[in-house]
Amino acid sequence: MLLVGVLWIVVMTYICYRGIEVSANFQKILLGIELVMLLVLSVTALVKVGNGTAPPGHLTPSISWLNPFHISNFSAFASGIILMVFIYWGWDTAVSVNEETKDKNKTPGRAAILSTFILLVTYALVIFSMQSFAGIKTTGNGLGNIHNAGDVLSIQGHLVFGTTPFGSFLTHLLLLMVLSSAAASTQTTILPTARTTLSMAVYKAIPSAFAKIHHRYLTPTVSTIAMGGISIAVYLLMHYSSNGIGVIGDAVIAIGLYIAFYYGLTGFACAWYYRRNLTSSARNLWMQGIIPFAGGLILWFLGGWSVWLDYDVATANDYTMWTVPWIHWQVGGAFVVAVIAALVGIAAYFYCKIRNPAFFKKQTLTRSTETLVPDPDT
């Protein structure tokens, strides 16, 4: 299983390495499989709920399920937002590859908005259908059954589609959808981060080797391979930890915290960058100032709240607990993962600042700096 996971990342890295067109076409296939199968699953489940053939314990769909004021406490709300930020991560890939789109001034923004809408509708439909079909009971196929938590779609898929040959065929397609989703997630982790390190290298924030472009595929070679290699290293580290599955779950929470941090920072940066335009029109004030800044504040507040919850074992919604050496404090696993990641990031920051001081002295990137495009390697 470990070897399969490593080979999986290698294959996804190679696809990203081969070019943006190959990656985009592969992503279309994966996304198409996901959306079609989730739609078929959801509609079939809702039809069975409607005609009374769903398993005992099914529920009638209710619009009240979307009411945030029905959430039991604010901590659960904050944790849910951070989790959704993690789920959304990767759907903004078009923004990271904007220079490689046909219309870099409009297409990435439209794609980001469209992808957000598609993700929202898809998740709402699947959640409504699965909660209606399975109910929240703690036995059988109920969503409250902890034994179903690791493979909800597979368990519900067998019941939704039935045991007929065609139903079995759809169930296997659903499992293929899960596999394609894993592939798409891996690809949308490597692809945008490679472009981020490419941009950082072009402006000399990190070593210039990360700015190398393949002469034929026109992809960032070192950046792509490095991101794939880091993914493998993290995967191996998680696998060989004392509580592998639990640590992976905590890593998801910790990554969500960092995504909330840098999404929030992006909102602040947007408001600051366009600060001179804010008084020119009401639209600019809202779209370039108030909304990005408010979004940044909300994400930082919820992220900070979640960090505090993850620090205290009594309130942490984590998968593991860790005891701090010498002082014997018990803290949540997500907090530990977040702190370790922060220490690694701080060390990398000082290393790059010492090796590449020009960027940190604002000599390579200012407001007036033109967009730099690296030449492909010959």
Q: What is each of the regions a protein language model found here?
A:
Residues 111-187, 206-255:
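TM-loop-TM module centered on a large, flexible mid-protein loop between adjacent transmembrane helices
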Residues 29-172:
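Helix-loop-helix junctions that connect adjacent transmembrane segments
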Residues 2-57, 112-116, 258-263, 284-298:
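Membrane-interface loop-to-helix entry segments
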Residues 223-235, 262-265, 289-310, 337-342:
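Hydrophobic membrane-spanning alpha-helices of multi-pass integral membrane proteins
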Residues 88-101, 165-208, 252, 261, ...:
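Membrane-helix boundary/coupling elements in multi-pass transport proteins
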Residues 15-21, 206, 230-251, 274-277, ...:
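Transmembrane helix-loop junctions in multi-pass membrane proteins
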Residues 1-7, 13, 52-77, 243-247, ...:
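Inter-helical loop and helix-membrane interface segments of multi-pass membrane transporters/permeases
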Residues 267-291, 309-378:
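Terminal cytosolic tails of multi-pass membrane transporters
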